[in-house]
A protein has these predicted regions:
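Bacterial Sec-dependent N-terminal signal peptides
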Residues: 1-4, 326
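Acidic, small-polar-rich N-terminal luminal/periplasmic segments of exported/outer-membrane proteins
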Residues: 3-104
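Outer-membrane beta-barrel translocator/channel fold
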Residues: 54-58, 146-158, 162-247, 397-455, ...
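Exposed, low-structure sequence patches enriched in small/polar residues
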Residues: 78, 103-105, 246-289, 303-520
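Short structured motifs
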Residues: 94, 121-124, 238-239, 302, ...
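Outer-membrane beta-barrel translocator/receptor signature
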Residues: 101-150, 154-159, 169-172
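An acidic- and aromatic-residue-enriched active-site/binding cleft used to recognize and process polar
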Residues: 115, 131, 139-145, 179-181, ...
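Outer-membrane beta-barrel domain signature, strongest for Gram-negative TonB-dependent receptors
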Residues: 169-301, 308-336
Length: 520
């Protein structure tokens, strides 16, 4: 009887034991992650506003602001040129960033952290499976921070709701999400010339009495205040007292139905899918004091630039999975975009304020597992000449052989400029352009990665870029006084750019301690 009771207890323990492997997160690109509840140095790398390793990013003086990038990669694949305004999108949740959960018990994750000067960040995720087939996930990120300097306050709310559904017979799948994001920033434009002087020099000040006279000490010297600009940054004057914001809503759905299903292996051999995305963005820039930093403003206009962007994408795709031939996905997409700027009630005459584009894409993805390695091929072809995004990418990855793993990738891509490179409208006279003659940017990239256990990982990338497009400050900015005025132009380099970077990661264990280094 005692032995039977022990067996029953062991059976109950096995039944009730759940590891983190049961808590899964699915992404659109096919990635599957398990919830990680461990405490390690990698978690500390991600314990920041972005919730990711910010190794290549240089932070601004406040959270929720933009970042300076210290490294670039040119092997990204996109199916449609972006809106632009990339400084506003570092912490923006794209459709590919949304996770679809599958959890055996209710799951909660809460991230909380204080920030600069009376600031807080809270990011909470609550996920629950109402049944084995249906999951609902609610997530919200809210933040506010005053910042160290004048007029650098930030605040934002980023709401995400996702649903993951798999039918009981596993022949139908649905991924659905809704996002609502609102990000607000005060824009200081950096320190004014006086602010820079006080910041660098930190001069001392004489103390004056009520009549404006200097106060004399007993030794004959005058009483002074020692001022340290580094410790009192909130008093340093800035160039601007402006505000900017990005507001966005998105609805996304991906439905997949198996046409031929292998019941023995519980895998789909042939399936048909439909995907829909509707995204709306509203960008605003308000300068009630009409700063002269960006030049002259149209007469009688209060600076309140506004932009509206609508993107709608419809995709139909077919997926086949045969052991001998690998997994093949073929899709056809229709994309419509509309970008509209405020016309200030017709005061900006002779300019267009609306740009509408349509594009059709044909793309394919092939994955094949061999004995010791895997090959992945991605191709995308735009069928129209405007708003082009063409690429061909091939990836070769080996299995771990004697703890050594190798990954190689080659990419050739061509894409049209971002929309704000082509088209922009503002109350500032110098910030209105329509560049219809920009060439498509072309790039060829080769990357490699070699890793041995967790001891060392070396990765490198070599890229050749033609017709690179970027924003550059004009050398003859307005009156030539670079310190007082800013004029930015869209620039395209006709010559070729060669870009190379190499990154080294190493981890050495000493008992329960680890020594980790990353260099680039």
């Amino acid at each position: 009887q005692q032995e039977q009771e022990n067996l029953e207890k062991q059976s109950e323990n096995k039944k009730d034991t759940l590891t983190t492997d049961y808590y899964k997160i699915y992404y659109l690109d096919g990635r599957v992650e398990s919830v990680d509840t461990s405490l390690n140095i990698y978690k500390d790398y991600k314990f920041n506003f972005l919730r990711q390793d910010s190794f290549e990013f240089l932070e601004m003086p406040n959270v929720g602001s933009s970042y300076n990038k210290l490294g670039y990669t040119f092997n990204n694949r996109i199916d449609y040129p972006k809106l632009g305004f990339r400084g506003k999108h570092f912490h923006y949740y794209e459709a590919e960033d949304i996770g679809y959960y599958e959890v055996p018990t209710p799951f909660t994750e809460i991230f909380a952290k204080s920030s600069f000067e009376q600031g807080q960040i809270l990011d909470a995720v609550i996920s629950i499976n109402l049944s084995q087939e249906l999951n609902f996930t609610l997530a919200h990120k809210g933040y506010k921070s005053l910042g160290k300097y004048v007029n650098t306050r930030t605040r934002g709310n980023q709401f995400r709701f996702s649903t993951n559904f798999n039918s009981k017979n596993k022949k139908s799948k649905l991924k659905f999400h809704i996002t609502s994001q609102n990000m607000f920033n005060q824009e200081s434009g950096g320190l004014s010339p006086d602010g820079i002087y006080f910041f660098e020099q930190a001069p001392n000040y004489f103390v004056l009495d009520n009549f404006g006279n200097q106060i004399e000490n007993e030794d004959g010297s005058f009483e002074m205040i020692e001022y340290d600009g580094y410790l009192d940054r909130s008093r340093l004057p800035s160039r601007l007292l402006a505000e900017s914001s990005l507001y966005s809503k998105r609805v996304f759905a991906d439905f997949n139905r198996s046409l031929i299903y292998n019941n023995e292996k519980e895998t789909s051999i042939l399936s048909l899918g439909l995907q829909f995305k509707h995204e709306y963005k509203k960008l605003e820039y308000n300068d009630p004091y009409t700063s002269a930093l960006f030049g002259e403003v149209e007469e009688g206009i209060l600076v309140s630039d506004q932009s509206r962007y609508i993107l709608q994408k419809n995709v139909i795709y077919l997926v086949s999975d045969f052991n001998k031939f690998g997994k093949l996905k073929v899709d056809y997409s229709l994309i419509n975009s509309n970008n509209t700027y405020k016309d200030y009630d017709g005061n900006l005459s002779g300019l267009i304020f609306n740009l509408e584009n349509k594009q059709s894409n044909f793309s394919s993805k092939w994955i094949k597992d061999f004995s010791f390695f895997k090959i992945e091929l991605n191709i995308n072809k735009s069928l129209k000449e405007e708003m082009v995004s063409n690429y061909t990418s091939i990836t070769f990855k080996t299995d771990k052989i004697k703890n050594i793993e190798i990954k190689l990738n080659a990419l050739s891509a061509e894409k049209s400029p971002n929309l704000n490179h082509v088209f922009f409208r503002s109350a500032y006279k110098n910030y209105n352009w329509y560049n219809s003659n920009l060439e498509n940017q072309k790039s060829s990239s080769l990357s490699a990665e070699l890793s041995f256990k967790e001891l060392i990982k070396i990765s490198g990338e070599y890229s050749i870029i033609d017709n690179y497009i970027f924003f550059r400050e004009s050398t003859n900015a307005l009156n030539g006084e670079i310190d007082n005025f800013r004029k930015v132009d869209v620039n395209q380099i006709n010559s070729q750019i060669n870009y190379f970077k190499i990154k080294l990661f190493s981890k050495v264990d000493f008992g329960k301690f680890s020594f980790i280094n990353t260099g680039q």
